[in-house]
Design a protein with these regions (language model features):
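Well-ordered alpha/beta subsegment
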Residues: 88-119
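Short, conserved beta-strand/beta-arch hydrophobic-aromatic motifs that form part
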Residues: 38-95
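Amphipathic alpha-helical segments
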Residues: 15-34
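Amphipathic alpha-helical interface surfaces
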Residues: 20, 24, 51, 108-111
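A general boundary/transition motif marking the beginning of the first structured unit of a protein
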Residues: 12, 16, 100-103
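A short, surface-exposed helix-loop junction/capping segment
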Residues: 1-14
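Residues that form generic nucleotide/phosphate-binding pockets
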Residues: 10, 27, 111
Length: 119
């Protein structure tokens, strides 16, 4: 995992995003303890060692929360999906906007488990 300083710098001035990230990271590490995070310029990567999910700031400054991105082969329509972007005929990129720490729940971990298995 990257150092605390990189994580603090990435979420500087964004307390809600930081709280959502910590809840998500705690749930992911509870399910997959070998998972590592890497803080990059525009996102934080979750991998073990290959990446399976990314979190980033929302696309618009007026939006609150944290954007979680992962890839699925055949995502079923879900109202919690913020956006689904087809990459090709067999794969789509899924974006989920997390607006509270409680949204890092069992349903979301199931989606991430599917993304981990399909990469």
């Amino acid at each position: 995992m990257d150092g605390i300083f990189e994580t603090v710098a990435f979420f500087s001035g964004r307390p809600l995003e930081c709280a959502v990230f910590e809840a998500l990271r705690t749930r992911i590490l509870g399910r997959w303890p070998q998972t590592q995070t890497q803080v990059m310029k525009t996102c934080v990567r979750f991998g073990d060692p290959r990446p399976f999910a990314y979190v980033s700031h929302p696309p618009r400054k007026s939006m609150e929360g944290l954007l979680l991105t992962f890839s699925l082969r055949a995502p079923q329509a879900q109202e919690r999906y913020f956006m689904v972007v087809p990459v090709n005929s067999r794969r789509s990129t899924v974006h989920v906007l997390l607006q509270s720490p409680g949204e890092a729940d069992g349903w979301l971990l199931g989606q991430l488990e599917q993304a981990r298995n399909e990469r």
